[in-house]
Amino acid sequence: MSTTATVVAPPEPQYEYYFRDGTTDNKREILTGDKAVPTFEEVPVVDIENIFSNDFDERLQAAKEVAEVCKTVGFMYIKNHGVSQDLIDEVFDMSRKYHAQPLEVKKEQDVYQSPTLRGYEIHYTKTPTGEAVKKGSFLYSYDPDNDPQVPKLTPEQRELCIGIHNQWPEKWPEFRATMLKYQAELLKLSRALLRTFALGLGADENYFDPIVTAPFVSIILQHYAPRDPQAEDLDGLGAHSDFETFTILNQDMIGGLEILNKNGIYIPAKPIRGTFVVNVGDFLQRISNDQFVSTVHRVRNSSGVNRYSIPFFFSFNMDVAVPVMPACTSEDNPAKYEPRNLHEYTAERRRLKMETHKNGIHDALG
């Protein structure tokens, strides 16, 4: 008597799709069981107090700790960062007040009135009954006149500083003053972090100093409108990686940020008061010769209440062609990328995002 064996087909792979390098068909398989690989299951908290130390050995040790996280996770909470909690609270308070204004008042700073698309933008999502507000964004950028280290610039270099075309509420000078104060504090922190990254990658800690005299900076006051937790579309910002050098995120206590690990699983970055979330961007991965990782992430607002966040995107001077760091190359590991002018790089990335990203110009421009 013969028997017939039943062949069970393996399950079809499941994937998470994300936006990167101008395309939306990037994917990562969701790995479970025997297919799972070692990866992070939480976002680490790093105490960066010693990056400000006068002792080089303490700065070096802190840089090694930061670099290890940037190589394995690409995301971290940072504490003891030196930015006043009172200022952070004031910025959030003003952001809430700004977004609570009538739409016609906010549209006085419509992004399309600015040649560099700085100002206010609103995003909608489809609902069974039509459209609803998904989120609102107020964007402003680096203005050299408000840098604690005011640079000497040629007219051509100044024109590359898109913040010279920032739009501000005319009848609310305190708003502008507070946001520029916040920008100044984060510029100090960003330059310190960049020295830490350089040291952690084996370079001189001042390696990047000459090319962040007039950096590309973009700051966005985000308001995610309340959503029905049962709604199909809960993405406040779809899966993507940041194309700048790095991001410092200031999030409220509602939560919603999720980080994609190597197994294709999203890990929540739950808010921790007194910290910022810092993540590696595509350009930093590029110039580190892929030693640092720019990790995919998304925002989902399933809370049913208003959510606010303030990402601060930081990159180098726009007119400099930045090469892969010599400290990240060797005879056996040559540079994988050609030097790239950041102005050209970001312009191309914006163009691709503008053409393909469903969430509009804010997500294209960062």
Which residue ranges define each predicted feature?
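Peripheral, non-catalytic segments flanking oxidoreductase cores
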Residues: 1-366
